[in-house]
């Protein structure tokens, strides 16, 4: 909020507005090289002057947590990413992405000067296992792992997420049975702030573990529209 107001969420938690909050800017630079149509290498930079985010602050003179959106001087990320496709016979194929990310956050938050850097790693991908060509049964795995990272005051613990899909399609292509599991390892993002006088921890569950079973019958010559997958390997969740 850009209002100069204070909302008391509880006896302990306060949400402060910030009338001095400014719009942020973002500049992206990418340099990509592809080898043999199987391997892709990318160097990138994300420069964000006046980046803003809501952070928590614990004052020294009273028991309270103040949540306030604040502008950084900048939040800059520089990284290298390598992507590869793989295939093992007719029963296994997929891709893997590995990213090395260097982040530098700088700002002044209340009486806390923040000038922090961190080198993090992200590994993600997709694996398709075909159990039976005759019966068209396949398992799709989508893992995501991020090492320790930072955001302003916060330290972000390593995070592992795994989604899985088991799909059966009839020989004529009309029937499909799809079983899905999202976040089946019940992963969560844990953040903590322990610099200076701060001692604050928060867990973010995104999303909760859930399972679904779907039966699909295609009428006539209907074909499912192919959707282009969004590259989320640098998003951090």
Please tell me what each predicted stretch does.
Residues 1-2, 17-21, 29, 48-56, 66-72, 84, 93, 103-109, ...:
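Outer-membrane beta-barrel proteins
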Residues 1-28, 43-63, 182-198:
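Surface-exposed extracellular loop regions of Gram-negative outer-membrane beta-barrel proteins
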Residues 30, 34, 38-42, 93, ...:
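Membrane-spanning beta-strand positions in outer-membrane beta-barrel proteins
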Residues 31-35, 45, 84-90, 100, ...:
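Residue-level signature of outer-membrane beta-barrel architecture
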């Amino acid at each position: 909020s850009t209002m100069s107001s204070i909302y008391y969420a509880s006896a302990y938690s306060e949400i402060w507005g910030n009338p001095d909050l400014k719009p942020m800017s973002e500049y992206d630079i990418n340099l990509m090289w592809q080898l043999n149509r199987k391997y892709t290498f990318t160097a990138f930079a994300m420069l964000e002057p006046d980046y803003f985010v809501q952070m928590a602050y614990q004052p020294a003179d009273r028991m309270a947590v103040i949540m306030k959106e604040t502008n950084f001087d900048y939040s800059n990320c520089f990284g290298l990413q390598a992507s590869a496709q793989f295939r093992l016979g007719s029963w296994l194929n997929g891709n893997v992405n590995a990213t090395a990310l260097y982040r530098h956050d700088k700002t002044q938050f209340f009486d806390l000067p923040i000038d922090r850097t961190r080198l993090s790693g992200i590994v993600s991908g997709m694996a398709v296992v075909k159990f039976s060509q005759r019966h068209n049964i396949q398992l799709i795995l989508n893992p995501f792992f991020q090492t320790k990272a930072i955001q302003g005051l916060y330290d972000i613990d390593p995070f592992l997420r795994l989604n899985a899909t088991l799909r059966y399609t009839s020989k004529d292509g009309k029937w499909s049975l799809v079983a899905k599991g999202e976040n089946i390892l019940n992963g969560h993002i844990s953040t903590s702030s322990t610099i200076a006088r701060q001692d604050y921890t928060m867990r973010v569950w995104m999303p909760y573990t859930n399972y679904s079973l779907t039966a699909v019958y295609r009428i006539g010559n209907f074909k499912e529209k192919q959707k282009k997958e969004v590259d989320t390997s640098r998003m951090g969740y």
